[in-house]
Amino acid sequence: MSNVTHQPKIGFVSLGCPKNLVDSERILTELRTEGYDVVPRYDDADMVIVNTCGFIDSAVQESLEAIGEALNENGKVIVTGCLGAKEDQIREVHPKVLEITGPYSYEQVLQHVHHYVPKPKHNPFLSLVPEQGVKLTPRHYAYLKISEGCNHRCTFCIIPSMRGDLVSRPIGDVLSEAKRLVDAGVKEILVISQDTSAYGVDVKHRTGFHNGEPVKTSMVSLCEQLSKLGVWTRLHYVYPYPHVDDVIPLMAEGKILPYLDIPLQHASPRILKLMKRPGSVDRQLARIKQWREICPELTLRSTFIVGFPGETEEDFQMLLDFLKEARLDRVGCFKYSPVEGAGANELPDQVPEEVKEERWNRFMQLQQQISAERLQEKVGREILVIVDEVDEEGAIGRSMADAPEIDGAVYLNGETNVKPGDIVRVKVENADEYDLWGSRV
């Protein structure tokens, strides 16, 4: 055990998705509450925590490199996060890591920190920790994680093996956290999980309580409650269950943002079956049409995989045909890559890398054209924009159709009389395939 007499300092690196970021925020909040200082430099710290990602091979490599960098610069390293579920893989490369825990193992991480860098006797920082906790996002938006794990067994994914089955947070806890965020100045709440639509399934949608009132543990009830907070509410990772239809009217009424992030993954029924994903493309197209009739302002974001094992040119053409008909607003596309432990690794007819690359290019070319056409329709219109950054040249923000980091931006050239978090009305003057340009009205 170390004998720490100074204010103990912890270095921290957070990798991966927003769900991992929320885990990091929770650990950092606890450390700050206990009196630890969090520092940006490894060589200044008494030890380093690396919160890893292990979803795809490139993420594993990035995590292993971050661990190595921390070991080289500091020497005392605790590893947590998704890759931590594969301890042998980490120890094979970095045997000198002090401790390894899996994802959302907050208590274990803190116990290990206490062992190697004991808690300070006095805690001058306690009163400085904000009620909403330590946040790694800008002050005006925050991620709200509503559950852990996932009950699906998609063949390309290993998340359930790392994060387990679905565990929904009590709805009272979720709503109380949301209220604290809004009280602290947050203007946009981004609801995240592995499967937001499944919220409450594991507890049979039991009734919880918030402010003494009964509230059902479900995505729809959660959206209804969040809409009362008077801030932007954005839904991510929404699996296309039937009850998703019930949140569209809330969007049409302006209660939550008209934005749905639905990872569809493919459009060939045969490939979707191999992926163990729902496979009725015609039904999905009909629902998209119905959603847009109810809520014309709806923005649809999705992600797809090309080059999945067994994908033929015919399967890929079905995907392109789906894109042409669905005309989604925001789309991400990944070339399939094997992930250790994923069922898809055992499938026959692996697609050659050059074919994956060629299909990815065709996919992106088509979607960029669709996206450019969708954004061009906004030129001349007035939209609301939340400001993210301001400098001497102007401001950069996002419309209701744009989530941070993954979607486009709205550029307000010369607009310096605003601050981050302001929501302003903008007339759109120009557009390309991803971004908009405009002036404040």
From Swiss-Prot:
Residues covered by the MTTase N-terminal domain:
8-118
Per the entry, the cofactor note is: Binds 2 [4Fe-4S] clusters. One cluster is coordinated with 3 cysteines and an exchangeable S-adenosyl-L-methionine.
**Major localization class:** cytoplasm
Domain Radical SAM core, chain residue ranges per copy: 136-373
Enzyme class, top EC level, equals transferase
Cofactors that this protein relies on:
[4Fe-4S] cluster
Ligand binding ([4Fe-4S] cluster 1)? C17, C53, C82
Kindly list the biological process annotations in GO that this record carries: tRNA modification
Domain TRAM stretches:
376-441
Gene3D superfamilies, alphabetically?
Answer: Methylthiotransferase, N-terminal domain, Nucleic acid-binding proteins, tm_1862 like domain
Which GO CC annotations does the UniProt entry carry? cytosol
Q: Name one Pfam family in it.
A: UPF0004
Q: EC number(s) of the enzyme?
A: 2.8.4.4
Q: Where in the cell is it found?
A: Cytoplasm
Q: Which NCBIfam families match?
A: 30S ribosomal protein S12 methylthiotransferase RimO, MiaB/RimO family radical SAM methylthiotransferase
What this chain does, per the entry, is described as: Catalyzes the methylthiolation of an aspartic acid residue of ribosomal protein uS12.
Family membership, please give it. Answer: Belongs to the methylthiotransferase family. RimO subfamily.
Q: What is this protein called?
A: Ribosomal protein uS12 methylthiotransferase RimO
> What organism is this sequence from?
Salmonella gallinarum (strain 287/91 / NCTC 13346)
Record gene name: rimO
